[in-house]
Amino acid sequence: MSRIKIVCTSTGCLDYAPEQYEEIKKKIDIIRIHMFFQGKEYLEGVGFDPADFYRIMENVKDVKGNLPHTGMPTHEEVAEVFERWIAAGYDKIIVIALSSYLGGTWNFIRLVAKEYQSKAEIVVVDAKITCFQEGQLALMAQEMVDRGCDVPEILQEIEWRKAHQEFLGVDERLDYLILNGRLKGGKAFMGKAMNICPVVHFNHQGELTSLFSAIGPNNALKKAAAQLVQWIGARKKEDYILYRTFTGKSLVERQQALEPKFEIVTNHPDVIMSCVTGINVGPWIVGYAYVPIRRPDEELPPVPSYYYEQTGKIAE
């Protein structure tokens, strides 16, 4: 009988997942992203609480001179994960990796996985998103492994969720978006001059884009809330997961204060965003993660083509 191991990149926030996931997350291994800040190197999720990290970022006087950055895991780190679980008797491995639009990590892990094709069936999934929604894909995959599901069925469920989940966030300040090159030229200048706050969103191709903008954070929060309500539509509360997510908490109280007006009711604990995400967008972003739960009447997509491409299997 096959043994399937689930792995997730550290950006999936499993290290700081809510208590309800305490037992199941222990079954999932983590490939860690490197972080460089104030002359020191860290592995994400090891020895650095994200809340403390964001407090430090908020108080940095010279942001440009102290700009943190990230680095991919090394070949040795990724190979060690594969070798360890293959040696432990696992013949199938699913890796959930942060969106390929956010850097080369997904592709790098996929290339390392190719070196082990003769030893195990390894599939590296592009989550097309990051933070805890990425981690939730890994948690769902682990739940399915525990129920005895095989890799193709797990990937079908993952692809359905990827196609339906949504994230949107309001960034109170543009400093990190500008310095990291995500906001450039005239848009950057006018944005700072006019106190424009972008409402950012992961499209279903996995790209972090500006969905729309507003003058001032309150107007941006209102636009974000209205968009969220539109996405949810008439879907019943038991058919989705909804929670707040943030880097720093500067806007969380204002976010909560608007919720009654828009009849927004979260049904899951808040989850802090990964430090790697904060490095790119800054410590002043708040948002919502909306995760539909597939109903029996909602059809699964076919087994994704990347399953056959990465494993060498032939589609039936």
Language-model regions: role of each:
Residues 3-5, 10-40, 83, 92, ...:
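Mixed-charge interfacial surface used for oligomerization/domain docking
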Residues 40-95, 100, 107, 114-115:
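Class I S-adenosyl-L-methionine
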